[in-house]
């Protein structure tokens, strides 16, 4: 029994490799269809990201790519804060999230993001759409919502202009999103559209109308 116990301990401690604390170094941050700056907000070192206003389509590769990341399976954790730009339209929701498994050409990636204005909206339908999964280029939110209503979005409590902790666990074709240290995932996706073997970089993603901030990021590969 002692040998079995020791073996279990070794297995559990080696399931994940060492956690990588992401340092915000400009030479390792590559903006793609966004503007980027390093700032301090509420005492935290953060990356500020705003979508290029000439990009009218939604669910696009509008992110800051972390060039020193190569991610397939594991855990991504980050604190995000979202504000609405002064020129944001009524349909702006504070879209902010994480792109992962980004290919070298930025033409394919998976994504999980949040809509902070929906978290406490006076509409149950909007609350039910506080989180979102999509896969670029073929499975944007509108297609997923039409073909599988409610399956790729869900409710979570959140608001604008406050730090929100996101944790994404990825394993093969499955991804789980946890918000603000929830014990259970608020969104569960069992069929990542790029498949179990996709891998690539991680990106700090925003969409239309958002002034987004990212802080305290760490990545643990499996």
Predicted regions and their residues:
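Bacterial Sec-dependent N-terminal signal peptides
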Residues: 1-20
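Extracellular glycan-recognition regions
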Residues: 18-222
């Amino acid at each position: 029994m002692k040998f079995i116990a020791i073996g279990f301990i070794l297995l559990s401690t080696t399931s994940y490799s060492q956690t990588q604390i992401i340092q915000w170094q400009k030479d390792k941050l590559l903006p793609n269809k966004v503007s980027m700056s390093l700032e301090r907000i509420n005492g935290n070192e953060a990356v500020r990201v705003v979508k290029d206003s000439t990009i009218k389509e939604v669910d696009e590769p509008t992110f800051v790519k972390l060039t020193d990341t190569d991610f397939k399976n594991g855990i991504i954790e980050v604190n995000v804060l979202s504000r609405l730009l002064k020129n944001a339209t009524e349909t702006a929701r504070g879209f902010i999230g994480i792109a992962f498994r980004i290919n070298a050409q930025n033409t394919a990636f998976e994504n999980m993001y949040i809509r902070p204005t929906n978290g406490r909206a006076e509409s149950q339908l909007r609350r039910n759409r506080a989180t979102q999964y999509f896969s670029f280029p073929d499975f944007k939110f509108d297609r997923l919502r039409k073909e599988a209503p409610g399956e790729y979005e869900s409710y979570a409590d959140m608001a604008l202009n406050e730090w929100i902790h996101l944790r994404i666990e990825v394993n093969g074709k499955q991804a789980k999103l946890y918000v603000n240290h929830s014990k259970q995932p608020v969104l569960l996706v069992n069929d990542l559209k790029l498949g179990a073997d996709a891998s690539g970089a991680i990106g700090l993603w925003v969409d239309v109308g958002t002034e987004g901030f990212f802080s305290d990021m760490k990545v643990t590969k499996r």
